[in-house]
């Protein structure tokens, strides 16, 4: 294929996927928009000098909002509010006086500012952790009170305050006398060479007790578990401040504030620093796809207008049709400043190592992936046709800039993940090739497949070819995070894999004091096999939601009116793993063995596996990846002796992982000391074969001895 007629800025993408050639001009236009914005940002300085994207983002979070100068003891506050006529800083520091601290009149861009000199005794004019708001006078003369848009601390009101004034969150001036000092270097991560295994976690539910757990409890109690399991990254959910706990963190009100339910900003810094000391990366589940409709404690109607940060409500683009939330106007320069600064802030101030971008499908399309527009078939016209795709070019351009920024800030450790169900081509190709710049996308079809199998098919009817196709159906050159279940499957109304497999028997039959029932025996065996085949065949990275590694027995339901504000299901029962008399520890130890086996033998971040066998009658799947041989026998009753498995490289093979070990809840039917010698005869299109014993519902991983 000749690239001479392909626009230079997307030649890399087309060389990776020649099917993109008819759409090269569209791809080029989309990249050009992001590059134009980048040019505008670099030249948006008062003196006309050039600034980097990193400088732009850092200067923004260091300029806007409230900032205390530790040397001069001055406090400077800046706020962009173009619709407001006047602005006043009010709070406990001035007894909520509406007149005493008027901000300087907005400049030509709509920015108000005020500088507060220190008190006569040399203290800051605003005490640390005291309540604060900004009051705007609108064009019609009315007044509105808002939490500053760039606030770094917001808290729930006391019961007495809530009863009197409502549950609106309270902004606070965070300026601790002794801020946390990071002690440990970030772990390095090289996308080209390193594997990544991600533990998805929610701080508030990370306790067996029915309560909101804390950052400190997570640091002390959960981080050591994650380290033991062998995960090398944590993805923290529901960190950005959200007034409604039951929203799972997806209705963000205060973008620069971390959730105060779990503790202080210094507590979160300690958590991340401790994770780094263990060699664990920490990723933030970042919500830039939408925002809460709250106005008094959120961004909505912040300066009295409906279109400051968001598309106008009259435009048809200002609200999400399903989420009851506001949608950002990514084409606005000030919105770009706000969101890009938000990313830089979390990287610099909290030392996050990257982001999982939530709701990317909703961002990418004007139809938000809802209704007929969300029925993606894989036809390239659905993504790249000028007439049919419905792509939001501005949102895509913002995501490109976001990836540029994160990788510029963290050249040795950045990780960006897109939650995209649509399969948008080039999303996870490098920006230099004309792609979106993400490192990974979530393989969202995989959990759907497993749930559908368990809901609708008997074990004898499992289609091996369909399983393999779904696990390997991903775009060449674009990495995916494989997972068989995440927080989505744990939510009330759905079931975890363990619950689909064992249901109510998990409450009565998980004891080791009696022989496992048929239901429990099947459930434990398939739970391990599903996780291992997803891990080894489904992608270039792996993700697990907290508790699912040991088959957490219950769904996740946050306290709300519908459940009488109960915390009973808003917790993770780690006590089940610690009980030696329960079989949950078997699943937990298998998960640890699987993660640590991958760390030692490295199969995730390697080329796609070669699948040599998908036997529908025997229910056997075999494949090779990075020199390792994986064999799965999904047959419910049939074990096979001297079963021939094709293998490309001759030599002696030994088992390095076996799901049937007793400590993993298995039956110890396999002799792991045995060596397997290849026979120099072609089998299943491989140059050699070995013969193995594979019991029913068992998987083994073999590695050639060097």
UniProtKB/Swiss-Prot annotation:
What's an example GO cellular component term for this entry? fungal biofilm matrix
Q: Name one GO molecular function term.
A: glycogenin glucosyltransferase activity
Mind telling me which Gene3D superfamilies this protein's record contains? Glycosidases (3.20.20.80), Golgi alpha-mannosidase II (2.60.40.1180), Immunoglobulins (2.60.40.10)
According to its UniProt entry, one GO biological process term is: glycogen biosynthetic process
- Summarize where (1,4-alpha-D-glucosyl)n binds, as residue positions: 96, 133
Active site residues per record: 358 (nucleophile), 419 (proton donor)
- Entry EC number(s): 2.4.1.18
Broad EC category: transferase
Keywords of the record: Cytoplasm, Glycogen biosynthesis, Glycosyltransferase, Transferase
Thermal behaviour (record text):
Optimum temperature is 25 degrees Celsius.
Under the heading InterPro entries, the entry gives:
A-amylase/branching_C, Branching_enzy, Glyco_hydro_13_cat_dom, Glyco_hydro_13_N, Glyco_hydro_b, Glycoside_hydrolase_SF, Ig-like_fold, Ig_E-set
The pathway entry for this protein reads as: Glycan biosynthesis; glycogen biosynthesis
- CDD domains linked to this entry: AmyAc_bac_euk_BE, E_set_GBE_euk_N
Looking up SUPFAM superfamilies in the UniProt record yields: (Trans)glycosidases, E set domains, Glycosyl hydrolase domain
Question: Organism's domain of life?
Answer: Eukaryota
Q: State its location(s).
A: Cytoplasm
Broad class of the protein's primary localization:
cytoplasm
Activity's sensitivity to pH is recorded as: Optimum pH is 7.
PANTHER family, sorted: 1,4-ALPHA-GLUCAN-BRANCHING ENZYME
Stated family: Belongs to the glycosyl hydrolase 13 family. GlgB subfamily.
Q: How does it assemble?
A: Monomer.
Protein function? Glycogen-branching enzyme participates in the glycogen biosynthetic process along with glycogenin and glycogen synthase. Generates alpha-1,6-glucosidic branches from alpha-1,4-linked glucose chains, to increase solubility of the glycogen polymer.
* Protein name in the entry: 1,4-alpha-glucan-branching enzyme
